[in-house]
Swiss-Prot record:
This is DNA-directed RNA polymerase subunit beta. DNA-dependent RNA polymerase catalyzes the transcription of DNA into RNA using the four ribonucleoside triphosphates as substrates. The keyword Transmembrane does not apply. The lineage of its organism: Bacteria, Pseudomonadati, Thermodesulfobacteriota, Desulfovibrionia, Desulfovibrionales. Keywords: DNA-directed RNA polymerase, Nucleotidyltransferase, Transcription, Transferase.
Amino acid sequence: MAQLTKNFGKIVKTLTIPHLLNLQIDSYELFLQKDIPPTSREDAGLEGVFRSVFPIEDFNRTASLEYVSYEIGEPKYDVPECIAKGLTFEAPLRIKVRLVVYDVDEETENRTIRDIKEQIIYFGTVPLMTEKGTFIINGTERVIVNQLQRSPGIIFEHDSGKSHTSRKVLYSCRIIPMRGSWLDFDYDHKDILYVRIDRRRKMPATILFKAMGMSRADILRYFYEVEHFTFEPHHVFRQVLPDFYRKEKAYSEIRDSEGKVIVAVDKPITKRAWRLMLEAGIEKVEVDPATLLGLFLAEDLADPATGEVMAEAGDELNADLIEKLKDAGIVELSLLHTRGVDTSSSIRDTLALDKTIDTITAQVEIYRRLRPSSPPTPEIAANFFENLFRNPDYYDLSPVGRYKINARLKVDQPLDFRTLANDDILKAVKHLTFLKDSHGPADDIDHLGNRRVRPVGELVENQYRIGLVRMERAIKERMSLQEVATLMPHDLINPKPVAAVLKEFFGTSQLSQFMDQTNPLSEVTHKRRLSALGPGGLTRERAGFEVRDVHTSHYGRICPIETPEGPNIGLIVSLTTHSKVNDFGFIETPYKVVKDGQLTGETIYLDATREIDEVIAGANAPLDENKAFINSMVGARIRGDQVVIPREQVTLMDISPSQIVSVSAALIPFLEHDDANRALMGSNMQRQAVPLLRCEQPLVGTGMEGAVAKDSGSCILAEGEGFVHYADAERIIVCYDDPAVGTDTGSAKTYELLKHHKSNQNTCFGQVPRVLVGQRVVKGDVLADGPGIRDGELALGKNLLVAFMPWCGYNYEDSILISENAVKDDTFTSVHIEEFEVVARDTKLGPEEITRDIPNVGEEMLKDLDDCGIIRIGARVAPDDILVGKITPKGETQLTPEEKLLRAIFGDKARDVKNTSLKVPPGIEGTVIDVRVFNRRSGEKDDRTRQIEDFELARLDTKEGQHAAAIAANVRRRLWPVVSGKTVFQTIKGVKKGEVLLEANHPMTQEVLEALPVKKLSGLFTSKETNEAVAEVLDEYDRHIQFIKGLYDQKREKTTEGDDLPPGVIKMVKVYVAVKRKLNVGDKMAGRHGNKGVVSCILPIEDMPFFSHGRPVDIVLNPLGVPSRMNIGQILETHLGWAGMELGRQLAEMVDSGKAMEGVRDRAKAVFDTEETTALIDGMSDDDLRDALRALKNGIVAKTPVFDGATEDELWSWLKLAGLPEDGKVTLYDGRTGEAFHRPVTVGCMYILKLHHLVDEKIHARSTGPYSLVTQQPLGGKAQFGGQRLGEMEVWALEAYGASYLLQEFLTVKSDDVGGRVKMYEKIVKGDNFLEAGLPESFNVLVKELMSLGLDVDLIQDEKKIAKAPPRR
């Protein structure tokens, strides 16, 4: 039955939210390509790494180890087994390699194949991802966080005038590869261009150009326009070039062929005049000879007679040189154009600094700069330079880098060309000089077009590459040390370096994190998180404000709200609801395409770069029925700026208003009315909400709750159409119609439900079935709710009746006053599971033993332990109770003669062991819910282990029987159309004696088919075709039964076999204790708007403020917490929740009071008032409508999507409809006196969460406990069972009060006076409470410290021994 909800959203959804875990799951699937045949795999992920590292050749090129393919096996243990046993969820990886041995001809160096050996080699294990997008590493669930990193490619920057005292803006360019040397071009304040390779010493950039094979003239001609001048006696002419216009004054009259003056003397040559000159065929114009001075030669000039070089390209022209050239008879000059507004002589000036003369010297110079230690030969230098940027083994731009360079420099190289071409470098420098000369804008490094996401698949791929490169070195060494012809591939390959790198990455990397598993929302947001930290990223100390700030390109891609509050603010962010990551790693967001002011119905995903030139309208721009803009002027965004423009210019439109925020922020109703800081706190605190004993979905939601619940993986969803064959609290079995679902298991799938599962944060995760036996389900239906989920929707807190008013100071400073009902009814009770582990080891003195026979322990302490010394399930335990009894052998101590005698007479060895039992730590009180015992494979099993095994085997038998019955039910369903009405040729007898189910020659009925065992249907019918059809189905049935039998046999085998325990461990026991945490004073609570507080008082229900009709409120909040925090969303939620609560109650009452259904139906339509819900109500029968309205007795669920929610008018109209005051205020009465409060109070319904900051886990009390070894002072902190620190400020306070005896007690016997502590204990025992303080241990520490500095300090007890100082003279 559909739940009736009121949706206040106006914008029609045209695109469903992509699966929230797609990024993690798809990325790792692409990395593994597990189910793709080896021949069809893409050159990416694991396949790409193997292809890039192999083939591996030896140094003499006599052998080559080639990669063929890989295969990934099935994991040995499933996910629950890995978590229980503390193992890694992984699968074996095997690679097929080929060792080719060659014969090399010494003269020609040609190779011929001598031998080929192919082999499949075990290559370690590879961690697998669970269906929820997590990894199980050593039994703990971890998440690999996606990294947000600077994209490979090219970037142009400037320093904004901050680098040099002259405040001159210095431009730079950087080419960043995925792997290889960085290339930086930087201008200095003198306009000299330098290059740095790998951020080493800088050198003139022209050295790099020369190393690339360019001459001085080539360099100058590439970067400058060339002008041609001609000397004639007493005149200098410049050639007129069609595509080279210069604005200057005419030196002499310019006439056309007819003598008509085009430009007069000293008049400027305009563009029109230039065009007339070209039309008139004028090829040269006279210029002032003085203009040549200071220009630079474009090429070398040689004496025509002798061939001697008179001037080199780049030399400056002066009067002497001009005369020299004229004397030599040179009449034509090619000069560089360096005097334009946007041209400068920077490249020529750099060339003048460059002392290298040709390619070889340039390459040698680069080698020297990068490898200063060894002098190179030209061949080594040339090879080194070639490897820098042109060898794919050493330099890899990656497809992303090539794509970015192609787009920025407008070059057209294929994406698989992943090294640097000369053209790339030259165009980059040319663009850099253009930016410098024209003072153009630099690239924005914080723009999302210049930052990309490295998802989990790519991060693991990089680790594999590191490991394989290490392995490659070892293989090459082995090939050179041994005779390759006698070796097999497995002799060369050792996968340990790869395994070590992977283990380090998954276990200790900054990006491999312990999953935040407080509730399903915290899981989802952790998997959708992007981190700028980690290897190859930023560090929080060095990250500036700009990189942390919200950027216009984040719109629709990265949430501007959700980020941590501490030092990581802005460095750790979240993906928005609709965003995707494309193949290049850039974040994309969806838009609707607009043409001529009308939507085309097409949806496209764009990254931040491709969006730059688009004009994008907001999602809430009003449209008519033809999906055209109603208003002629529309609000839109261009390059991040808000503008109002004609509708015809709009090219795109937002998909949804919620596309700009993340999942957590999209769960906050009326987010648009909250201050950004409080919204940030609200989205962060929802992740800390503890799943409660009884969940309740919010009365005021946003519509995102269902998507989060279903995509989190905490719910169990139906995989297709079918019916529920079996359902209980442990498992659900669904029989599917589609044979493709559960192919091996006869289209019947068993779903095991989680029960009392301990999460990473110790919260209790359990699943509750939501379907009944026989119920039809379709794909995506919720079969079972997870923790913090109700009816397939996220439900983290409770709907409470709230009043905003002060109450005797108990809600001062955000404190919360709450009704005793919340504790009595277990409203905010949550269950937390603590895991305790004890290990029995083999020690040098003998083995430890887990036993009930513990020395010096009374029977009372052992009452809940079984014969093996392990606590029984269901036992209530308190601090210091024994969970598992364990004794450890003691070292031999010196015995007195009397003890030796007794030992010899009675043979008493019992005192040789000490009690090392596992006890309940302080602050934990609960019930034992599970015990797991792990034994060595070869070890003997105790009674408890056998008992657990027997119970598990019985469960497996039951499960197998239920699964087989489900397969049989599916078979009967498939057979019924085949056998319906078909006659049987023999009488069918029942189980009971003499019972006949069906006489011979009678048609088959449904009842008989259900009563008959499936196997007995074989050959039962008179029709041959029917028997054949039945036999075909039964063959399939046999195959499925055999498959599940094999499956359960494997599970039985695993249950009875021992465990792989670490070396030296005999037995391990894990005990799980469920702790019930009721709401307590000091617990932290919060709403969804950043309105957090601590419970200050739990008030008896009779003292709570109450309404005129007698109902008390549940919670009282401080009204002063709203105005200054500016989170008005909580007030709007309160009003809307109150209206929904009241309207739901009224509709349920109308049904229960027996009112005419016609009136009830009309009232329901008036309340819900949307086309969709009205149609749903009209389509319901009276009985269905009654049931649906009765379900609303606690309130109507209202959905108010972010930025598209309920307006004030709608809110007021709902309050009016419910018969409530429109201002949301009523008069309340004091529960203690019964008198009305002086002013009306804002009341309503608010969704309140209990956060994972529980007072029971924070506060503890110490009388005596552990002391520090050095200072002998009590330790600090709850974990060490430490004491409260008494610092110097507290000492000053006690001094101020003159409490000298108290102070002496604090500083001596209560702290570090060891002797005094013992004496104090004796005095208390005797009843003599007299303080006798000694010397604090810290004083002795001070004395020893002074001694270590060479100062001998003696403590003199007797005054007479004090030496008197001699009198001063």
